[in-house]
Amino acid sequence: MNIEIDTPRPAGAPATENGTDSSLVHPGAWITLLLALLIASCAAPDTQHHIVISTREQKLALLDRGNVMAIYPVSTSKFGLGDWRGSRFTPLGQLQVAEKIGGNAPPGAVFKDRLRTGEIVQANSPGRDPIVTRILWLRGLEAQNANAFGRDIYIHGTPEEWKIGSPASYGCIRMRSSDIIQLYDIVGIGAAVTIVNVPLATAVPGLVTAHSMSAANPAPFVMR
């Protein structure tokens, strides 16, 4: 049996589309909503995964409990390194994944101000350089990268895939659409991100370095 709470409707207040009073609320609906909000707010941060980015080598390593899962080629800022407000530099140091955006978007989906525009841009489309496919929005955890979140520093997809492997961004970390989809599906909010200006092998002890991701061999190295 449904129990309804009948709250008097103010004079002139409209009824719902089906002619019933919108103030008649099922308590069960409120409970379900409150539980959903509670679960969302209490979701545990991702402490399992760690992203390490080498601006020196233009590579990104994904670690699972300290073990390397994959290494991807990336593209960091063509303007250099730093975190000054209004700059187009890639910040260094310890950060974390603050927000994930675009989980259901198709490859090449264009984002403006973190909202989908409805446009799809194919890889290497001439003259096009929007943010596409997925966004991992980063928050700095140190004084040297405290402006990263406000500067909209992301790990995101790019249609300029031919530039991956060399500095070409305006501060963000760019990836190929297929690679950012893989990364997005694995890491959660709160995952640690470390950006360094040294080789990955220096930042990640025990890293396998035999695989070269040069322009002649740009494929990601994936360890399963």
Show which residues each predicted segment covers:
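N-terminal secretory signal peptides that target proteins for export/translocation
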Residues: 1-25
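Sec-dependent signal peptide recognition
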Residues: 27-33
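C-terminal motif of bacterial Sec signal peptides marking the signal peptidase cleavage site
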Residues: 39-41
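Bacterial signal peptide processing site
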Residues: 43-45
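Post-signal peptide N-terminal segment of mature Sec-exported envelope proteins
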Residues: 48-73
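Well-ordered beta-strand positions in beta-sheet-rich domains
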Residues: 50, 71-73, 94, 152, ...
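Electropositive
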Residues: 69, 73-105
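Exported/periplasmic cell-wall-interacting domains
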Residues: 84-89, 105-224
